[in-house]
Structure formats: C-alpha cells, structure tokens
Amino acid sequence: MESIEEKLTQLRTTLRHHEFLYHVMDAPEVPDAEYDRLMRELRALEEAHPELVTPDSPTQRVGAAPLTEFSQVRHEVPMLSLDNVFDEASFLAFNKRVQDRLKSTDALVYCCELKLDGLAVSLLYENGLLVRAATRGDGTTGEDITLNVRTIRAIPLKLRGDNIPARLEVRGEVFLPQAGFEKINEEARRTGGKVFANPRNAAAGSLRQLDPRVTAKRPLTFFCYGVGLLEGGELPRSHMERLQQFKAWGLPVSDRIRLVKTPEEVLAFYHQVEADRPTLGFDIDGVVIKVDSLELQEQLGFVARAPRWAVAFKFPAQEQMTTVRDVEFQVGRTGAITPVARLEPVQVAGVLVSNATLHNADEIARLGLRIGDKVVIRRAGDVIPQVVNVVLSERPEETRPVVFPAQCPVCGSDVERVEGEAVTRCTGGLICGAQRKEALKHFVSRRAMDVDGMGDKIIDQLVEKEYVHTPADLFRLTAGKLTGLDRMGPKSAQNLVNALEKAKETTFARFLYALGIREVGEATAAGLAAHFGTLEALINASIDDLQKVPDVGIVVATHVFNFFEEESNRAVIRDLTEEVGIHWPAPQVVKAEEIDSPFAGKTVVLTGTLSQMSRDDAKARLAALGAKVSGSVSKKTDLLIAGEAAGSKLAKAQELGIEVIDEAEMLRLLGE
C-alpha cells in the first residue's frame, strides 16, 4: 500500500510536471480543473501531515507573513546593463566594432532574442532548489524578493533533470502579459484601486509588494535569458545551447530566438519582430543581439558597465511627453460622447500622434487633466494612443479645466449620464448627424445588411448632402442621385443601387444586428431571432420575456425593451419592412418537443470557423430544428460544434465534459 510520503512525492512530481508543460513547453496535457484538483489533494494531505511539508512543494509558493521592508542582496556577479542602439546605422557600427576586435570572424554567430519590457531578476538555485530571488537594483546591490517570486508559477521552485550545478544563478525578466494587465486595471477601476500606466509598471509594482499574497493574485510570468553565478557544474559554451539547457531544467525560455550569421539576418529578425509585436500578447521594446560563442564573448570583454558582445536594438519609443492643446468631444453611433485630447504632434512608436482618447469624464478626473498640461502619451501596436498620466511637475500656470458639454456638440440636444454608467450620451437619436452617420455605417456593414460597395465616405457624403436621414432612405436612392457624389460614375452608381436591392433579402438576425440596439451583437441578435421567430413577437416582448433568451440578462433585456418602446424606432422599422420591403424567410414555429431532430431542445454553442456555411446560416438551421443557440459555454450547454481554429470555448467545453462535434458531423445531422 502506498505510504503518505510516497503519495506526497508522487503528487508533487505530477504537479511540477504539469507546471513544466504549461509554463515552459506551452503544451498543457490536462485542463486547469485537473491541476487544481491535484493541488487541493496535495494541500489537504500536507495540512493533515505538516511535518512532511517541504520548501519546494508547489503549495509553498505563498504563505509567509508580510514584510516590513525588503532586505538588500549583493550580487556576487554584477548584473550589467546593455548598450542601446536605435537605428540600423548604429547596429552596423556595433557589428563592425565586434568584427574589428576579434582575431577571426569565421565563428561569429549572433543570437537574437526579444527585449522584454518587464523587470530583470536574479534567481539563485542551490542543488536545484530556489533559495533566493533579487531585483537588479543598481547592478551591484538589489532587493530580496524571494517570497514574491515564489508565487510566480512559471518559475520552478525545484529544477528538473540531471547535471544541475551546485550553485546556479539564472537571470531573466518577470513581466505581465497584456491580458493580465487589462484584467488588473479593470478590477482596479471597479474597486477604486490603483490603475497602472503600463504592464511594466504593473509588474514592478507587483514584485515589490511587501505582502506576497498580493503578488500571488497578479498573473506574472517569466522568461530566462542568461546566467550569472556558476559553481560546481558546467554549462555549454554557446549562449543558445545554455538557453536550451535551462529549458530542459524547467525554466521558461522565449521561443522567439534565432541564430544568425550576418548583419542582414539580424535586421530581418528585428523587422519581423517589430511587425509581429502587436500580436505577441506581452510588451517588448526591442531585440537583444548577443555573440553566441562564450569564447568570443571572453575575447570581446566588457566596457564600463556593459558587455562589448551584446547590444539592445530598441524599437521607436511607445511613450512620449507632449502638451494637450485642447479637448474636443466626438459623438458615436449610440450617442456616446467621447473626449479626445488634441495634442502637440509627437512621434510615438514611429507614428506622428496628434490626438489621444480620454474615454470619459471619470478618466479625465482620474488623470486630473487640464488643458495645457504636459502629458505622457502611449501607443502600442494598433491601439489608439492614450494619455497615460499628467506630468504635474511640468504643469504651467495658464492651464484651464476640461468642461464636459451640457449639449451635444453636433446637434445641440441635451446630454445625459445614466446612474451607474461611465458614458455621457446625446439624447438626439437620429436627428443627430453624428449618430446618423455612424448608425448608417453600421447598418450597411458586412455583418449587418451587407451592402456591397457602400463605404464610409459615401455615407458621409449622403448625410452631409442631406440625401439620407434614416436607413430606409438608403433604399430610395437612385443612380442619378448617386452619380452626383465624389468619384461616383454612372456604372458605380448603378452597381450600388443593385447592391441595395439585393440587400433587401436578409435574415431576421442580420436585420436585428443592423438596427444597432445597444449591447446587441451578432450572437445576441441570432439568439433573439431564434427565440421569438417574428419581429412582432420580439417588439411585444416584456423584459421578463427577453430574459428567457440564452445569454440575455437584465441589462441587455432593458436596452432591447427600451429600443422597441421608442416610437421613432418603430417608425424606422415600419418604413424598412413595409415601405422599402426588407424581408427574410418566415420561420417554421414548432415546439421543440414536437421536432424529430437530434438538436431539438438542446442548448448549442458554435465556435471556430465553419467552411461549408456561414455562422448565421448555421444558427438559423439549428434554431429551426429546435435548438437554443447560445454564445457562451456553461454547465447548461448540451452540445458544442467546433469549427476550425476553435479556442477557449472548446477548452471549456472539454473541461465541463460537454459533448463536442465537428462541422462534418453537424452537417450529417442536419442532413446536408
């Protein structure tokens, strides 16, 4: 019979194995729920037998009392910084210096890595056990952050494998992925906590918490990139091979590393990473180029506080300081009034930025922003530039406050802010030109009425020339009237008239989505269409009736109910359906229990990409066969249909034990 000690050893080994697969190999083999179950089992056994708890147990990541201050750590091998280059010419000059100093360049190979935008840390392992973690500090002395680092699941408390040196100091970067950063700030805004300016600040703030229980709640992760102290063992004489060895021992290493032989290949790597930067999921601020051979590194040596054999090739800065010239207010499709900072133009991440969103009145208050202030602007990837913070030390005397308008800046209607909402809205509806433009652009968009050739610039002209006031007016346009628009010849005008005629035949779900009801996206529109079947039934539905639709709660139900209660909206709908002639196939309303179908009465979720039919068509077919089509997976879900590139919904369905079929099986059951 297995002893308690053996069971504890087996559980710890299994959990470390799954941590290695998840954090290092990026290939988990069990769902999170199974990992959590094993952890609960281990924790229960250790609570029953506290004398058998070991420091390297996966349960011992959190548990120490809060510190009053951090102790100092002196680095036995200094943590040096890197010299920076900011353009190709400077990198080529670095490459020339390297070549000039070497006796021979035959063996010269560069190892190219990502320059992570986090916090550099030192991890000291003794006989494979993590005994200390420290910040870089000034390079000679850092702070002891061992208790906090132990909470980071990507960092192994015990190395795996053989031939581990007696004392090994691993160096790397602790950072916060974008998704985790957004989650932390969302929670902070909800609770009135501290909102971080960027992921790096959030990572640094998380690591420097005196209470490790706070750090444990932050989704920090780690990549290693080098070694400091090495005693009682050997490592390969290639930097790349060292990283591969670290990975084998259970330490996470970035998979974006490449060995190259020429400066041209380095530049190609740099530009490829720069292009991929928005999709990485975490912040980087450049690439690091290192001579791969340890022998050549030793020949090159160091200068001052940086190695001669490595350089950081930085991307254009993502943050810059500039001045707020003014704040203007834009009106969106739903009437939301958004303040926009007009800035002294400044280059940020290679783009000239002159505007930045301020989101809403609460954000202006949080920033303490005044017109004339010096501010820090951040732009990451394709994200709209944002004001990160006000530089109060640079505030001039002549600043003035930002005043939210009492009337819509476009139509003059009163504005309102509903209690509990952050957004201020114009009450003008379709009489507001700004709302009209955005509402019409949404109405004709591909996923709505799908009017081929009706672009934003055409809508702008139609509204400005007062040819169109409501969606129905679009369908009354003639080729002659359209020909008067910029860059619109007779043939293009006739093609657009034909496209409008074709768009009159649609689906109930598309029509609902096109109306632009607040909080009603494609999935919700499809659910409403499937549940009610007819427009009349939906218009007459109560808030309680609406909440019977899968994934429709009180907020969405109230928005839908209020939309149809508004007489002007009902008039627009009558005009579209009765006068213009927009129509869709009549539903065959049959009770689910009367339908002889494998989908009847089941709650079905679609995920991934379907190749044989559109998502809307699939939802309509399933609904006609008695299914309730939902947009999210829950315990109430009966069936998940997984197309290509299915993601988190598939994983959750598998975790909950929900039946999963592919598109081919769905088509077979549909009788296709």
From Swiss-Prot:
Zn(2+) binds at residues 408, 411, 426, 432. GO terms for molecular function: DNA binding; DNA ligase (NAD+) activity; metal ion binding. The active site is at 115 (n6-amp-lysine intermediate). DNA ligase that catalyzes the formation of phosphodiester linkages between 5'-phosphoryl and 3'-hydroxyl groups in double-stranded DNA using NAD as a coenzyme and as the energy source for the reaction. It is essential for DNA replication and repair of damaged DNA. Residues 594-672 form the BRCT domain. Belongs to the NAD-dependent DNA ligase family. LigA subfamily. It is an enzyme of class 6 (ligase). This is DNA ligase. Pfam families: BRCT (PF00533), DNA_ligase_aden (PF01653), DNA_ligase_OB (PF03120), DNA_ligase_ZBD (PF03119), HHH_2 (PF12826), HHH_5 (PF14520), Nlig-Ia (PF22745).
